[in-house]
UniProtKB/Swiss-Prot annotation:
Self-association and partners: Monomer.
CDD domains attached to this UniProt entry: Era
Gene Ontology cellular-component annotations: cytosol; plasma membrane
GO BP: ribosomal small subunit assembly
Gene label: era
Protein name: GTPase Era
Region called G4, residue ranges: 119-122
Region (G2): 36-40
Family matches, as PROSITE patterns: G_ERA, KH_TYPE_2
Molecular function as annotated in GO: ATP hydrolysis activity; GTP binding; GTPase activity; ribosomal small subunit binding; small ribosomal subunit rRNA binding
Cell location: Cytoplasm; Cell inner membrane
Record domain KH type-2: where: 200-276
Length: 290
């Protein structure tokens, strides 16, 4: 039996979280076209007769000197050194540039085994030729490259085979039925944040976080009270929407997803609260992403 820890890294919006969810068969990590939706190191667990793979989904790799981005990048670096295998996800639509160079340099210096997953091969307009030239120049062997579509489930089984080929014999670190080690509070909080980001498109990606105030299991249903925290007064109105339609829509979609995951009905009450300039508070940022 084989087992091991595998980190998933890449630029923002390359499909890292979609790949994690696709392999594990559950919604574990937020998926969105908005860059850097993932903030924490999210663990997804896949177990079959061959063994167990523990995936660590990381924030999108982005070169920036802002406190928030520096904190996110620290999560990426720590994930790399904790794992036996790295999956480097490249979006087939993206022209390779400075960040690809930096990511590959970090991977190669780490001396950790890796796979390059070229994602979104179902899309017609691509930079495949440029990507393959870039990888060839970096002396990446072809047997380390796999072309996939995480969303369309193309070559995902082949991907699993390739991962197991690169893992050593080892024990099951988690019970077979586990597909994540996230605490329920964090999962619910992340679902609400993900739905909010989806509804708002790219208006407030860095300016919100969510917190669970009350989570109670009351006989036949869960009672949940949660807060969506914003950094500026004007942002409250964007989330609440005209006549409260925005917050209502966020609540309805979040409730459906939470009920499905918890396998029980839930009452979800959402509030939008202002914590001025929270995204400039280094201590709070550290707590949120660790």
């Amino acid at each position: 039996m084989k087992s091991g820890f595998v980190s998933i890294i890449g630029r923002p919006s390359t499909g890292k979280s979609t790949l994690l969810n696709s392999i594990c068969g559950h919604q574990i990590s937020i998926t969105s076209s908005t860059p850097q939706t993932t903030r924490n190191k999210i663990k997804g667990i896949f177990t079959d007769k061959r063994g167990q793979i523990i995936f660590i989904d990381t924030p999108g790799f982005h070169l920036s000197k802002k406190n928030f981005n520096i904190a996110l990048m620290n999560n990426v670096y720590s994930a790399i050194i904790e794992t036996e295998l790295i999956i480097y996800v490249i979006d087939i639509q993206d022209q390779p540039g400075t960040e690809e160079n930096e990511i590959l340099t970090i991977i190669q210096r780490s001396k950790i085994n890796f796979i390059v997953a070229i994602n979104k091969i179902d899309i017609h307009k691509t930079k495949e030729k440029e990507i393959m030239t870039f990888l060839e120049e970096k002396k990446i062997q072809k047997n380390k490259i796999i072309k996939i579509s995480a969303e369309k489930q193309i070559n995902i089984e082949t991907m699993k085979d390739k991962i197991y080929e690169n893992l050593n014999e080892g024990p099951l670190y988690y019970p077979k039925e586990y597909y994540t080690d996230q605490k329920i509070n964090l999962r619910i909080s992340e679902i609400i944040r993900g739905v909010t980001i989806k509804k708002l498109k790219e208006e407030l990606p860095y300016s919100i976080y969510t917190e669970i105030e009350i989570l109670e299991d009351r006989e036949n249903k869960f009672f949940i009270k949660a807060n969506i925290i914003v950094a500026g007064e004007s942002q409250k109105g964007i989330i609440v929407g005209k006549g409260g339609k925005g917050i209502k829509s966020i609540g309805e979609e979040s409730r459906k997803i939470i009920s499905k995951i918890l396998e029980k009905k839930c009452n979800l009450f959402l509030q939008v609260k202002l914590r001025k300039n929270w995204n400039k508070n280094a201590k709070l940022i550290k707590n949120l992403i660790n």
